[in-house]
């Protein structure tokens, strides 16, 4: 990310070249597997998809969502990268809200279906590098809700909903506003894919990488 590039300059006085992750427009899928497994349908759930680790802000998300008045579900998809202790903490926090679903690790068509049919994709992280999951979510045409850390905000610019990091109340209010205002969500959905696929086009990333190798032969 640009933040990492700045860190190397400030800490080690090293000049670096920033080449971001890339993404292409994704093919949308009907909710077949996720309908059978979790009773999920188009636009009836909010999605977090990523590793279940503390720095991703999932605790804030659960705490905020439990205060939101909505029939929509919260789907937390992904596995833990270390022990299952944190995952169990999350499940304990969520156990009194039947709207919250943990899917575990997902891949393939199930992952595609989750991205394709979410009402909102959210990444409430305290710490990120270059969040590929955010690029992927926008490539599926999702309205995204992210924390205001630079690594997320600089990716989405003004094309997503943003809340103050670590602020459960602000996250709750932003979630509630999104659930109450489908027209706002649809606006972001309609612009997401074109914006992100133009800004982080894989062909451009490949060209920049090849150019760098040629210069340094």
Residue ranges, per PLM feature:
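Short hydrophobic beta-strand element within catalytic cores of glycosyltransferases
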Residues: 143-146
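Short, structured helix-loop element that forms part of the nucleotide-activated donor/catalytic region
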Residues: 6, 73-99, 110
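Conserved donor-binding/catalytic core segment of Leloir-type glycosyltransferases
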Residues: 39-56, 62-66, 75
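A short, well-ordered alpha-helix in the C-terminal region of glycosyltransferases
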Residues: 184-199, 208
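Carbohydrate-associated surface elements
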Residues: 3, 22
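Conserved acidic donor-binding segment of nucleotide-sugar-dependent glycosyltransferases
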Residues: 161-169, 177-183
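Aromatic "clamp/platform" in nucleotide-sugar-dependent glycosyltransferases that forms part
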Residues: 126
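Short alpha-helical donor nucleotide-sugar binding micro-motif in glycosyltransferases
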Residues: 105-106, 113-118
């Amino acid at each position: 990310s640009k933040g990492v590039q700045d860190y190397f300059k400030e800490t080690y006085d090293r000049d670096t070249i920033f080449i971001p992750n890339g993404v292409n427009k994704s093919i949308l899928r009907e909710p077949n597997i996720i309908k059978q497994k979790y009773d999920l349908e188009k636009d009836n759930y909010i999605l977090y998809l990523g590793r279940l680790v503390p720095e991703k802000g999932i605790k804030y998300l659960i705490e905020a969502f439990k205060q939101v008045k909505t029939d929509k579900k919260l789907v937390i998809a992904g596995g833990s990268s270390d022990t299952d202790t944190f995952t169990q903490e999350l499940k304990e926090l969520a156990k009194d809200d039947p709207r919250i679903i943990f899917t575990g690790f997902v891949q393939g068509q199930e992952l595609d279906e989750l991205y394709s049919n979410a009402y909102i994709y959210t990444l409430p992280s305290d710490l990120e590098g270059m969040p590929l999951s955010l690029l992927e979510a926008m490539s599926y045409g999702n309205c995204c809700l992210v924390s205001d850390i630079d690594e997320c905000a600089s990716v989405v610019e003004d094309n997503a909903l943003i809340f103050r990091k670590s602020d459960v109340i602000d996250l709750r209010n932003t979630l509630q506003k999104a659930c109450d205002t489908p027209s706002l969500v649809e606006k972001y959905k309609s612009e997401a894919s074109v914006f992100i696929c133009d800004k982080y086009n894989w062909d451009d990333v490949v060209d920049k990488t090849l150019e760098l190798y040629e210069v340094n032969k």
